[in-house]
Amino acid sequence: MTGYHALRRVLFLISPERIHTWVFALLRAVTTPDLLRRALQGRLAPRDPVLASTVFGVRFPGPLGLAAGFDKDGRGLHTWPALGFGYAEVGTVTAHPQPGNPEPRLFRLPEDRALLNRMGFNNDGAARLAQRLTRHTSDAPVGVNIGKTKATPADRAVEDYAQSARQLGPLATFLVVNVSSPNTPGLRDLQAVESLRPILTAVRAQTSTPVLVKIAPDLSDADVDEIADLAVELGLAGIVATNTTISRAGLKTPGVEELGPGGVSGAPVAARSLEVLRRLYRRAGDRLVLISVGGIETADDAWERITSGASLLQGYTGFVYGGGLWAKHIHDGLATRLRAEGFTSLSDAVGSAMRQ
């Protein structure tokens, strides 16, 4: 048992949302002093040039970023590069502040190496995040994930997303339109092409920042194809695949059905996330940047996503179960694999297994 695994057993005795708050506060405190932050970054951040790539015209020092959901309000913008991430996606943030769903709303599924959440986009609002981003001098790229305010009716969703895009687009490296969380009533209905088209068109009209859309793993293959075609048609920069799943199939943790509704992240979503990635790559090729998220735990998992078409990767649940060195281990393993397979750059490996 590693040191973190022993510590994790203790941390897992405390309620998930409470320990998240405590650990996040500790990480921010440790990475606030310049000297300590730079020392950590010097040891943990991806430095191997083989890992660097240019995506959206921006240099990413490593492909693995922190997924949306951990740092909803951009409170830890300096923290993530110091912990070895190549970038971070903050949010989901909505046009108006909202408290999210009642607690408890975050649960561990330890036998499945998974989490179940029904957070409901609890956040301080787009204006507050814009203030933080304005003050921030970036050590790494920062994406922003935007969602619909719960109180906004579906027929006003376009303006709700557009408002967030106006405020945050100029301050973000890239903008992700989240229409795939299962925890806001009716949100996933916006993935239907006839609903999605006006939202994406409006968001693109508000900003020159690269715009991506985040999709659910529970979509049918036909729906995945339609969204890929729409993204290409509208000139989107890419797709983030995938969000959490509402499926409970194959879960081993006792009592999971009694926990209530929510989205499952981590190992149980890995297979479908990979399937969706491969389908998107076959459909769109290099016309879209694909960011793969969902069930990435090891460097081998990361390698499979890269060679299946992902230019960038993300993780949240893997970080919770893997600990503070998780991102470094992924990046180190990827660098070793790239060289072993004869690649001189990460970009050359993207989609290589799909071209054989």
Curated annotation (Swiss-Prot):
Keywords: Cell membrane, Flavoprotein, FMN, Membrane, Oxidoreductase, Pyrimidine biosynthesis. GO terms for molecular function: dihydroorotate dehydrogenase (quinone) activity. It comes from Mycobacterium sp. (strain KMS). PROSITE patterns: DHODEHASE_1, DHODEHASE_2. Binds 1 FMN per subunit. It catalyses: (S)-dihydroorotate + a quinone = orotate + a quinol. Catalyzes the conversion of dihydroorotate to orotate with quinone as electron acceptor. This is Dihydroorotate dehydrogenase (quinone).
